[in-house]
Design a protein with these regions (language model features):
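Surface-exposed cleft-lining segments at the edges of enzyme active sites
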Residues: 12-16, 93-104, 131-141
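Catalytic metal-binding/acid-base residues of hydrolase active sites
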Residues: 9, 45, 132-134, 167-170
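Metal-dependent phosphoesterases centered on the DNase I-like endonuclease/exonuclease/phosphatase
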Residues: 127, 137-178
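N-terminal, active-site-proximal structural segment of metallo-dependent hydrolase catalytic domains
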Residues: 1-55, 65-72
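Short, Asp-centered acidic motifs that coordinate Mg2+ and/or phosphate
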Residues: 1, 37-38, 126, 160-162
Length: 178
């Protein structure tokens, strides 16, 4: 099984020559070229999700962090010929994970998107967790990881788990040790 994580950079008008409209073809070609079984995507807006669905060969799960269907979010792309989704969900990395919310020290709302999958040739389910942790506060990153461990405790205990994403942290930071 080949897996990847990819921060595709949010679509923003401030990027000028690096706007999504100029990058989307190359990003989708790259994703298709590597023929991953599964790829976790960060910093994706609804228009980018539409493009990923239209121009890649993958099935796409997605969730956005504002709770209004318009904001930045996460996606999990998977190849249905290799991987089957069994269950999926998402929650906020905050003190109220089941409703749109923000950690008090975070720069913006953050979410975790998860999926329970199995390979089409195997019968063993595995858990995939996609995150994009806070870019401002180390404490918010730790708190976010704690929420993930609490919300998915039973699944993590039961299934092999892949935690993927953009941690916004250096390799020696405490968030990598949880």
């Amino acid at each position: 099984m080949k897996i990847a994580t990819y921060n595709v950079r949010v679509d923003t008008e401030y990027d000028q020559d690096w706007q999504w409209s100029f990058r989307k073809e190359a990003v989708c070609q790259l994703i298709n070229f590597h023929d991953w079984s599964l790829c976790c995507i960060q910093e994706v807006r609804p228009n980018q999700v539409r493009d990923l669905k239209a121009y890649t060969t993958f099935t796409c799960l997605s969730a956005e962090r504002e709770g209004d269907g318009q904001g930045e979010g996460l996606a999990i792309l998977y190849n249905e010929q290799k991987i089957q989704a069994i269950d999926t969900g998402y929650f906020w990395l905050s003190e109220t994970p089941q409703q749109p919310s923000i950690h008090p020290e975070a720069g913006c709302p953050r979410i975790a998107l998860w999926g329970l999958f199995k390979e089409t040739t195997q019968n063993t389910p595995f858990l995939v967790i996609n995150v994009h942790l806070d870019h401002i506060s180390a404490h918010a990153r730790l708190a976010g990881m704690t929420v993930i461990l609490e919300e998915l405790h039973d699944k993590i205990a039961q299934y092999p788990t892949l935690l993927m994403g953009d941690f916004n942290a250096e390799s020696g930071e405490e968030v990598h040790q949880l």
